[in-house]
Structure formats: structure tokens, C-alpha cells
């Protein structure tokens, strides 16, 4: 299983002072050096953490894989096509939320989704949809032309005991179903050093996307050490 590191919260910390440090690009390079297989950033409509210039510099610097998380808007479509990350991930977005709170509503957007994704496919940019671990959502993602589904693990992260085991089973079943219909499978949201280990047993999940847990651990142990620790946990 591979690790993709989300560096949004490095930008959040920088923006708290309105200055230049810590630099999310430097964080991305350290994460790659420590074993990350990809870098994730979310260019939100309100630009609350990652800025347009960050995205340009990340594109120039990242040598593994750049995954641009984005809302389904014409503005961000144009930016993504101009930037050419290896991968874009469509996520839901609400201005009032602190972080992404759930999966992309594929049922609501399905009628326009295929046309929206076509330019990315033509440009050779892989497309991922951040969705709930739900069979209908996975089927619609495949029909819309997605290459990858990122299964939302937020509920798993919030639960404990038997309820968490049930959610893990739901995620595992969803991953198997997605793989069987030809989709690549990744997972993310709320994963941390305490709850990640069971995902090593879900062989269909190729990659996990983790940000907040790594950045908070890095405050105490350093970023390179925090990334190396997570890489070791998922191998």
C-alpha cells in the first residue's frame, strides 16, 4: 500500500501569519524523500490554505505524483487543465466546513459529470472521485468515466469497537466491488497512526491519503520522521 501525503495544513499554518513559512512545497519535497508516493493538495474555492502559486510551484517540484483535490467548477477545471497534475480528485466543498465532511454527491451531479471529466481524460489526467463506500456511488463513478475512487473513511475514523469493525467491513466490501468493475481504489479522511493498521488487510486499496495526522505528528517528531513512520505502518 502506498502513502500520499496531503500538505494542506502546512499552508494553513503559514497562512495563520500571512507570511511565507512554513512552505508547503518544502514539506512536499521532505515527504517524497521520506517515502511518500504522492503529494495531495486541495485548491479550495476560498483559497483558505493552498494558493494558486502553491499549486504552480508544487507542479514544478513534485517528482512522484501530484493529486489536485478540487470542487466541480469551471474555474478549477481550467486551472487543473493548465497545471496538468497526474491526478485530480473531485471533492464536495462547503465554505462553512473546517474540512471535507463527506463524499462527493455523485447522484446529484451525474448528468453533467461525464462531460465535465472528458477534458481531463483527453489531457491524460487521471480522474478520482471522493465518494462514500457505497455500491451505487461506485457504479455511477465508473459510468461517469472515473479511473479511481477514493473511499471516504471519515465514519470509520469516528467510530470505535464493533461499530468501527462494521464500517471497516463496509469499506472492504466497497473496495472489492470497485476493483471488480475495473476501478483503482484509494482511501482517505481521518486516518491516523492509531487506526491505519487494519487497512493493510484490504488488498484492493492501493493507496491511502493522509494529511492532518502526519502534520500534527511532525510538530513533535519532525516531518521526515512522521512520514517514515506512517510508511512503515502501511507496508
UniProtKB/Swiss-Prot annotation:
EC number(s) from the headed UniProt entry: 2.6.99.2
GO molecular function ontology, one term from the record: pyridoxine 5'-phosphate synthase activity
Binding-site list for 3-amino-2-oxopropyl phosphate: 6, 17, 190, 211-212
Alphabetized CDD domains for the sequence: PNPsynthase (cd00003)
Entries under Gene3D superfamilies matching the protein: Aldolase class I (3.20.20.70)
Pfam families: PdxJ (PF03740)
Disulfide bonds: none
Catalytic residue list: 42, 69, 189
A single BP term in Gene Ontology: pyridoxine biosynthetic process
Marked site (Transition state stabilizer) residue numbers: 150
Enzyme class, broadest EC rank: transferase
SUPFAM superfamilies: Pyridoxine 5'-phosphate synthase (SSF63892)
Database matches in InterPro entries: Aldolase_TIM (IPR013785), PyrdxlP_synth_PdxJ (IPR004569), Pyridoxine-5'_phos_synth (IPR036130)
Main localization category: cytoplasm
Protein name listed in UniProt: Pyridoxine 5'-phosphate synthase
Source species of the chain: Chlorobium chlorochromatii (strain CaD3)
Keywords: Cytoplasm, Pyridoxine biosynthesis, Transferase
Family to which this protein belongs: Belongs to the PNP synthase family.
Amino acid at each position: 500500500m502506498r502513502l500520499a501525503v496531503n500538505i494542506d495544513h502546512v499552508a494553513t499554518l503559514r497562512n495563520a501569519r500571512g507570511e511565507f513559512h512554513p512552505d508547503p512545497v518544502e514539506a512536499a519535497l521532505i515527504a517524497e524523500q521520506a517515502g511518500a508516493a504522492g503529494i495531495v493538495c486541495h485548491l479550495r474555492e476560498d483559497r483558505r490554505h493552498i494558493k494558486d502559486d502553491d499549486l504552480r510551484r508544487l507542479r514544478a517540484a513534485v517528482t512522484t505524483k501530484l493529486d489536485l483535490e478540487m470542487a466541480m467548477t469551471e474555474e478549477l477545471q481550467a486551472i487543473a487543465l493548465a497545471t496538468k497534475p497526474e491526478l485530480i480528485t473531485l471533492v464536495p466543498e462547503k465554505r462553512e466546513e473546517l474540512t471535507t465532511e463527506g463524499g462527493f454527491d455523485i447522484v446529484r451531479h451525474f448528468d453533467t459529470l461525464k462531460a465535465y471529466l472528458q477534458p481531463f481524460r483527453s489531457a491524460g489526467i487521471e480522474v478520482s472521485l471522493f465518494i462514500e463506500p457505497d455500491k451505487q456511488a461506485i457504479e455511477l463513478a465508473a459510468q461517469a468515466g472515473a479511473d479511481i475512487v477514493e473511499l471516504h473513511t471519515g465514519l470509520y475514523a469516528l467510530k470505535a469497537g464493533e461499530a468501527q469493525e462494521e464500517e471497516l467491513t463496509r469499506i472492504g466490501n466497497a473496495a472489492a466491488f470497485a476493483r471488480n468493475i475495473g476501478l483503482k481504489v484509494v482511501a482517505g479522511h481521518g486516518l491516523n497512526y492509531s487506526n491505519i493498521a487494519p487497512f493493510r488487510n484490504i488488498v484492493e486499496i492501493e493507496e491511502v491519503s493522509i494529511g492532518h495526522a502526519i502534520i500534527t505528528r511532525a510538530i513533535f517528531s519532525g516531518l521526515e520522521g512522521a512520514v517514515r513512520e506512517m510508511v512503515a505502518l502501511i507496508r
